[in-house]
Amino acid sequence: MNRVGMKATDFIYTLASGKKAKLSDIRSPYTIMLFFSPDCQTCNRTKQEMEASLLLKELIANKQVAVLTVYPEEDMDLWYTYQKGMPSSWINAYDKEQTLTLKTLYDLSALPSFYLLDKDKKVLLKDVMWEDVLYYLENTPSM
């Protein structure tokens, strides 16, 4: 399931506006996918570390990286409240149909969970921490 070197499973996510989109719709050399829960302390710490990263801000501004955050759980009130504090330069979404969980499309046994994808949505890193993603981005010559 979504192993390193394989193409990531496409799925539909929903934005706060109600608009639906697919992972495959994201056009970017790299996509950081973060599965998280607002009531997870590690998730919140990770979000703060990402927000503080000057490299990430620069890569997003230069359209080298897209960040997709996905809330895979069911408490929509919690998500709607939390997502208002998410960076507007990130794609902040939830799994309205609960497809990720019901069909076990991604390993979400622990949150936060990161996947780093290339432009073709091939998995470069799977189920790693933010530090691993940052290290990869810092050490990729084409960045």
Model-derived segments and spans:
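N-terminal "domain-start" segment that seeds a small globular fold
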Residues: 1-24, 136-139
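A structural signal for short secondary-structure junctions
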Residues: 5, 26-27, 60-62, 84-86, ...
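Short loop/turn microsegments at loop-to-beta-strand junctions
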Residues: 8-9, 30-31, 111-112
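Hydrophobic beta-strand positions
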Residues: 12-13, 35, 116
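Short active-site neighborhood of thiol/selenol oxidoreductases, capturing the structured segment around
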Residues: 21-50, 66-68
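Structural microenvironment flanking redox-active thiols in thiol-disulfide oxidoreductases
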Residues: 44-84, 98-104
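Short, internal strand/loop/helix patches
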Residues: 80-115, 119
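Thiol-/selenol-based redox modules, centered on thioredoxin-like
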Residues: 118-143
